[in-house]
Amino acid sequence: IRLSLVGSEMCIRDSTHITSSVQAGKGLWVCTYYRGIEYLDIATGKFTHYNKSTVPALPSEQTWTATEAEDGKLYIGHVEGGLSILSLNDKSVKHFVHDPQNPNSLPGNDVRCIYKDTNGNIWIGTSKGLALFNANTETFTNFHNNPGNIHGALSSYIFSIKQLKDNKLWIATELNGIMILDLQQNQFLLPEQIRFEFIREGDNNYSLSNASARYIFQDSFNNIWIGTWGGGINFISNAPPAFHTWSYS
C-alpha cells in the first residue's frame, strides 16, 4: 500500500507491514505490525503518530486493528498483546489481557478485529473467540458455547466482524465458517442462552467453499461477499440463486 502526500510528515509506505486501515470521520487510522498506529488527516495530509515515543503507556507497537468510539477512546487490538483503550484527549491507556483465573477477562490475547455496532457496543474478535466489552464494568462477556450446537465450542480465531442490514452480526472465523448472531438476542438473553447460526464448508450451493473465512462485505444491493483462505470468494446473492464461488489459481 502506498500513499504519497506532498509536504506530509511521512508516507504510509514508510510504515512497513500495514495490517489494517479504517476511516474515521475526516481521517484514516492506519495500523502497522511494528510501528504502532498512524492517523492521517485527509484534509491536511498530516500524520499523527501513536507509538511508544508519543504514548509511553502503550504496551506494544504491534497492532492488528483500531476502532474509534464516540467518547474519544481508541480501541487497539495488539498482536499477541491484548487490547488497549487509548484516550485521545490525554493519551492515557488502559490495557486488558487474558486472565485464565477470570472468566470475564479478554478471551484471547491476539486481538485481530474490533467492531462497533449501531448501538455503540464494542465487539472484540480474538484468537480464542468473541467477546463483548462492557465499558461500565471494564469486563468482557465471552461467548464460548452454543446451546444445542453439535459442533461444540465457539472459541475459533476470529478475523472479521460486520453488522449487516438485517441487524445480525456476521463473524468470519478460522475453520468454523461464518457465525451469525441476531443482536436482538443480546438484549434479552443471558450469554449462555444465546444461539448462533452458522454457514459452514460443504459441497452444496448453500455452503462455503472453505471453512476458513477472512472477510465479510455487504454491497449496496445487499449481496454478501465472503473472502476465504484457499477457497476463493464466496458470493451470497440477495436474490436466487443464493451462492456462487470464485476460485483462483
Predicted regions and their residues:
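Carboxylate-rich, polar loop motifs that coordinate divalent cations or form catalytic acidic clusters
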Residues: R2, S8-S249
